[in-house]
Amino acid sequence: SSSSAASDVYKRQLSKFMYILKRRKTMTNQMVKGNTAVIIGAMYAGCDCFFGYPITPASEILHEASKYFPMVNRNFVQAESEEASINMIYGGASTGHRVMTASSGPGISLMQEGFTYLAGAELPAVIVDIMRAGPGLGNIGPEQGDYNQVVKGGGHGNYKNIVLAPNSVQEMCDLTMKAFELAHKYRNPVVVLADGTLGQMAEPLEFPKEAVDPTIDESWAVRGNK
């Protein structure tokens, strides 16, 4: 069937990704940065579309996605702005893809309209916020000032985001995987909330033992006319 064929393609993609990532070694863990761990978790979670716009200290997540996603035939687009990237997320999510973006405080603020539209349309999406100091332009030092903004949703209307706050590089990976699970279970935006220190911190990461198969048909997704 087409579903099983798509599943086989995904498994080959993930196998190739892990072959590249492990540098042809059989080790089960490596020393990696938190930002890299996010992408590892996303790949295992079946993320097949990453749309984003670079901003310090989240830019490394885009760098890693731009490096690994094309290697295994997944979609990466550097948008022209934060507003464009969150609207690409909206479009990808509406067709059932596992979508993700990453940004920091000023960029997250620009995405708020997209957040509320995702919630209103009941679409799953994962947004990673690597927080930096504010208010305004602020600086690139680490801070936890985006907490109220992302927990309360940020955009207009009565809705909430699901928010996961990792405490280690391992949790940067594990909670990114969990974010995709929750986003698709509840059809709601999920934010992985960390700061610049955690994004730059390097710790041993144990790779996930199982991967998520993203080829399960979502009955609510827009598939186009046939």
Write out the residue ranges for each language-model feature.
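Short basic, glycine-rich beta-strand/loop surfaces that mediate nucleic-acid
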Residues: G120, A179, E206-P208
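Conserved thiamine diphosphate
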Residues: P142-D195
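Structural beta-strand/beta-sheet cores of well-ordered domains, especially the beta-sheet scaffolds
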Residues: F51, L123, I162, N188-V190, ...
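Short, well-ordered, mixed-charge alpha-helical segments that flank or form enzyme active sites
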Residues: L110, G134-L137, E171-C173, L198-E203
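Thiamine diphosphate
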Residues: L21-G153, K160, M177
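Single conserved hydrophobic/aromatic residue that forms the stacking wall/gate
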Residues: S1-Q13
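Conformationally flexible catalytic loops at phosphate/diphosphate-handling active centers
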Residues: R187-K226
